[in-house]
Design a protein with these regions (language model features):
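Active-site-proximal specificity loops/subdomain of glycosyltransferases
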Residues: 45-98
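Short beta-strand-to-loop acidic/aromatic patch adjacent to the donor-nucleotide binding site
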Residues: 97-109
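C-terminal catalytic/acceptor-binding lobe
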Residues: 165-170, 175-236
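Short, high-confidence coil segments that cap the C-terminus of an alpha-helix
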Residues: 98-99, 123, 210
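Conserved catalytic core of nucleotide-sugar-dependent glycosyltransferases
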Residues: 90, 108-187
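Cell-envelope/extracellular polymer assembly enzymes that use nucleotide-activated donors
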Residues: 3-7, 36, 200
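Active-site beta-to-alpha loop of glycosyltransferases that engages the nucleotide-sugar donor
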Residues: 3, 8-22, 43
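Short, acidic, metal-binding catalytic loop of nucleotide-sugar glycosyltransferases
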Residues: 19-34
Length: 236
């Protein structure tokens, strides 16, 4: 039996988190696989009573985090803190003997066939795509070819499996990638040129010889604002 750890740092609105868990409950698990959940609760103790069917640890949060009605507000310190929290989830996967680590940010609503499609892809590192509309109306996704966010393509709106340069937020990684030393540790000689822990992870993975891919058969839904959550609950 192959083991999958579904995991994420957790700092989220209760209602969004409940919708997130509902989507996890609907996931189709392939035959021969089993899935468990693990969260690192990051300064939002109010959500703890609502966690179900999951293990969790609680960490103190000394960094102020906020978001507007349009976007998250990220500082460099918050990004590196997020990297530390993601490393905590990797350690849980390694220590728990898991074969796959599936990181799913807690504002994402997964399609029921997400795990099935990611397992079928059979890649060391593969994400499932989701698209987000920025305040300026432009759409961006959680995969790109190079640098900060260059090389997104409309081709990825077609169902398929595509090689990419970088990805994150909704990503399945095989155990051997972590055993090779790939992590979310900050690369000390790359600073503002590549902002964000996902980018540093992808650079480390590429340097270790691993390819990165994105699957587009079952896009997730990104509820990163209250308005988007209300639209989702209204069935739009």
């Amino acid at each position: 039996m192959k083991k999958i750890l579904i995991t994420a740092p957790l700092r989220q609105d209760i209602y969004v988190f409940q919708a997130y868990q509902d989507a996890l409950d609907r996931l189709e698990i392939p035959e021969g696989f089993e899935a468990s959940r693990f969260f690192v609760v990051n300064g939002c103790d109010e959500v703890i009573p609502y966690i179900r069917d999951a293990e969790f640890v609680r960490v103190e949060n000394e960094e102020e985090y906020s978001k507007t009605h349009n976007d998250h507000i990220w500082t460099m310190d918050l990004m590196w803190k997020m990297g530390d929290l993601r490393n905590r989830t990797i350690a849980e996967a390694l220590n728990g003997g898991y074969d796959y680590w599936l990181s799913v940010d807690t504002d994402l609503i997964l399609d029921p066939w997400t795990i099935y499609n990611l397992v079928q892809a059979d890649k060391d590192i593969v994400s499932e795509i989701f698209w987000t509309q920025a305040p300026n109306g432009r759409y961006w996704c959680n995969a790109w070819m190079a640098d900060q966010s260059a090389g997104m393509t409309e081709e990825w709106r077609k169902p398929g499996l595509y090689r990419v340069g970088m990805t994150g937020a909704l990503m399945m990684v095989k155990r051997r990638v972590f055993e090779a030393g790939v992590s979310y540790d900050r690369i000390p000689n790359i600073n503002t040129a590549l902002r964000g822990e996902d980018r540093h992870f992808c650079v480390r993975a590429a340097c270790a010889g691993f390819e990165l891919w994105v699957d587009t058969h079952s896009p997730a839904r990104h509820l990163y604002t209250r308005q988007l959550f209300e639209e989702y609950k209204a069935g739009r």
